């Protein structure tokens, strides 16, 4: 169940981050409200995941790594961000780091 809360936290964070550009510097009301609510929900669900037994280091590593990878994917596919070798290698290294953290008994 802790992983379900974590997945929902990641998705809320990804939605909020994806909306940042549409807030136009937090000058547009509804995109700003939805963005800030997304971040609040994300942190609350991350906290629930940790309070229900997931190790803090594992939860945060997964939350940040998967969120980062998804944001890069969304930026490339939908927001016009160019793909580059640097981005691919960077996301690969992030994923490798999270896998390494989990394999070394951090949980």
UniProtKB/Swiss-Prot annotation:
Q: How does it sit in the membrane?
A: Multi-pass membrane protein
Q: Span of the secretion signal? A: none
- Which locations, inside or outside the cell, does it occupy? Cell membrane
One CC-aspect GO term:
plasma membrane
Pfam families on file = Multi_Drug_Res
Q: What is its main location?
A: membrane
InterPro entries per UniProt = Small_drug/metabolite_transptr, Small_multidrug_res
Where does the chain cross the membrane? 2-19, 29-51, 58-80, 84-106
Output the GO biological process annotations, alphabetical, semicolon-separated.
response to antibiotic
Q: Which UniProt keywords apply?
A: Antibiotic resistance, Cell membrane, Membrane, Transmembrane, Transmembrane helix, Transport
A GO MF term = transmembrane transporter activity
Tell me which family the UniProt entry assigns to this protein: Belongs to the drug/metabolite transporter (DMT) superfamily. Small multidrug resistance (SMR) (TC 2.A.7.1) family. Mmr subfamily.
Note the PANTHER family from the entry.
MULTIDRUG TRANSPORTER EMRE, SMR FAMILY PROTON-DEPENDENT DRUG EFFLUX TRANSPORTER SUGE
Q: What does this protein do?
A: Multidrug efflux pump. Confers resistance to tetraphenylphosphonium (TPP), erythromycin, ethidium bromide, acriflavine, safranin O and pyronin Y.
Q: What name goes with this protein?
A: Multidrug resistance protein mmr
Q: Which organism is it from?
A: Mycolicibacterium paratuberculosis (strain ATCC BAA-968 / K-10) (Mycobacterium paratuberculosis)
